[in-house]
Amino acid sequence: MSTIKYRAACDHCSATKIKCTQERPQCTRCRALGRDCHYSRSLRAGKPPRSSQGLNRKISNAPVLPRQNTPVSNPTSMSSKPEHWPTMPTSYPTPQAAAPTAEIFHFPDLSSAATSSSSSPANTDWFFDFNSGSADGLGDLTPPLVVTAPHLPPLDHDLKHPVFPTQGIHFGAFADLISLPPASPLLPSPSLADGDRCAKLATETLNSLYDMPANHLHGSGNRHPSVDQTLSTCARAVQAIHELVNCSCQKDLYLPMLIIIVASKIVAWYQAVAYIRDPGTGFADGKQCFREVVVEGPLNIGAYQLDDEVGWTLKNQIVLGQLQRLNEAVNIYDRRYCSDSLGGQMTEGGKLYASMVGFVKSTLQFTIHALEGRIRSGHPR
């Protein structure tokens, strides 16, 4: 007769998947819990069973605690509440108790097309509408969610459980917070930004008039800019003067001075191109110093090279047109910075601007009259 083999772990450790200490008659876990330690027979006599009967037998060997059967109470007994139960305050209402003869509520079949709109809402927007008091189709089934404090019976509560006043949640206080505009970043005002741009444009224009590229060799041995380079640079400078005098930005004391200096430098370069010497630009000792010198060269229109007389006629017309445009900008400058619109006394800055613009106007008018006289006489130079 073969010896009966028992399992290596007790039934409790095997059922809970815990390693057993395999002590007899009680393992450490059963001794700590005060349970009876029981070792079942080992089923490993041969190959393990392929069916699920072995698993069912393991589960059946586990001890089952006794279960108390509680009788099912009728619906009326569940709805009734003992008198000694305290009534705790709540912000949600208690639904009315159903009558014994009330019919059990059945949810409607959503697949049925004949379902009434009162039992199944057709519109699902009520789920996302947080401000409406009741949803369409559920107003008759859902009671109001606001219970006032006077309808609740007074109760004596412990200090450990404070009672908060029951009141409805009003979203009107949060509407102002939601409608607030987003905070705008701290950026400089447009007038200050435009003023910086105008100062940069005036400085760059004046530098271009002083640092004109000198690539051609003059008869004196020095290098100077050519006629076409001078005409191109001065045309861009006249356009910059128009932008500066028409800008409505806030200008400091020195920016108007810089603008009128740029205008005077443009007139000096055009006089050098047209070979016009202004007698009013000399020094007290009668000497004149001209820094604006250009190198004469033939003018080309594409592949066609103009002769000397036609080239001078074209240069006079180009210079006269640009000086007339510059004269318009100087007049705008005079009205804006040198004349007092209120009729009062002119400030010191206005007097300074008026003296500077007066000098530029006299030089500009002298050059324009000289060019117009050349064109009328038919002698280009």
Swiss-Prot record:
Function, as annotated, reads: Transcription factor that regulates the expression of the hps1-dma1 gene cluster that probably mediates the biosynthesis a derivative of cyclopiazonic acid (CPA). Further studies are required to whether the CPA-like hps1-dma1 cluster is functional or a non-functional relic reflecting evolution of D.septosporum.
Protein name, entry field:
Hps1-dma1 cluster transcription factor tfc7
A GO MF term: DNA binding
Q: Where found in the cell?
A: Nucleus
Q: Which residues bind DNA?
A: 10-37
Residue ranges for the region (Disordered) are 41-88
Keywords assigned: DNA-binding, Metal-binding, Nucleus, Transcription, Transcription regulation, Zinc
Q: Where is the composition biased (Polar residues)?
A: 50-59, 67-80
Under the heading Pfam families, the entry gives: AflR (PF08493), Zn_clus (PF00172)
What GO biological process, any one, is recorded here? aflatoxin biosynthetic process
Query: SMART domains, per this entry?
Result: GAL4 (SM00066)
What is the species listed in this Swiss-Prot or TrEMBL entry? Dothistroma septosporum (strain NZE10 / CBS 128990) (Red band needle blight fungus)
Give Gene Ontology CC terms.
nucleus
* Transmembrane annotation, as ranges: none
Q: Which residues form a coiled coil?
A: none
